[in-house]
Amino acid sequence: MVTIGTLGSHSALNILSGAKDEGFETVLLCEKSRKFYERFRVADEIMYLDSLSEIKREDIQEKLNERDVILVPHGSYISYLDLDFLENEFSVPIFGNKFLFRFESDRELERKWFLKAGMRIPRTFEPETIDRRVIVKYHGAKGGKGYFTVDTPEEYFEKKIEGDVQIQEWIHGVTMYFHYFYSPLQKELELTSIDRRYETTADAVHTFPDREPTYVVVGNFPLVIRESLLEQVFDIGDKVVDASRNLHEKGLIGPFCLETIVTDAPEIVVFEISARIVAGTNFYVPYSPYTYAKYFEPMSAGRRIAREIKMALEEERIKDVVS
């Protein structure tokens, strides 16, 4: 019997509770400092590690493979594990397409994906060509850490930036993060939920108006969108799924998120993608308005993942949903 597992971080409660809903055994790989998971009932087994990177150890991988574990990836896999190792040496099956994680970790590759999809995206700038407000972003899934805004080349160079960054046009509008699920078994795209992020100190700048805002994500707010805009939401989702097959033969599998700004046009401008589950889905356990309207039963993102794994096992197509 397959066991569903994940790393103890990010959206583990969502993932494992959904797996339990579908009748799977569960295992959590967790740092020793995070004892709080014992207070919940989602993990049948907790494997404590000194650090999450220990999942690279051969003996850990062997133990997981002996238990027939399928790991469900989330943002911590992108932040803390080496992508070359994950793609080429890691032997435990990963739900979804791990070969697309590189595209969300490198903003230039991500931009090429969006251009192939034909979506509206922000302009990018070189430091010397900044002529309007821009937001400067580091590569990778770091929850907004280190992002900042500038208006001129002089302001940019004052920051004495270290490391690779992308300079994006600042789009005026509201942020909305659309959570999708693509089923290769049913060849269908679903909208599972929507959120916006609670960021420090951007969401508290009114308290200290003279302080430069930062964008570290500490939580998420649930949202619904005007129903008249749902056509745009599905359109951009379909486009990014279609374009993903040009990047890797399997394309997108399972949950992903398009991070957007909705302008007053109204137009949806896409600025980032996460090619796996995002923490904004955590609010929607056991269901969202959109999953309820489709399934008429509790259906969280975690449960939808487990349902896809269950269907793949029943149809003997598990290779179609893992990498």
Where are these regions (language model features)?
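Extreme N-terminal starter segment of soluble prokaryotic enzymes
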Residues: M1-I4
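Active-site nucleotide/adenylate-binding loops and adjacent lid/helix of ATP-dependent enzymes
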Residues: L7, F99-S193, R226-D238
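A short, Lys/Arg-enriched amphipathic alpha-helix followed by its capping loop at the start of a domain
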Residues: I15-F24
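Short internal beta-strands
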Residues: E25-S33
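Conserved N-proximal alpha/beta basic substrate-recognition cap immediately N-terminal to
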Residues: E38-R133, K142
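ATP-dependent carboxylate/phosphate-activation module, predominantly the ATP-grasp catalytic core
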Residues: H179-S244, S274-A306
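Conserved metal-phosphate-binding beta-hairpin within the catalytic cores
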Residues: S244-F283
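Cysteine/selenocysteine-centered motifs that mediate thiol-based redox chemistry or coordinate metal-sulfur cofactors
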Residues: R303-S323
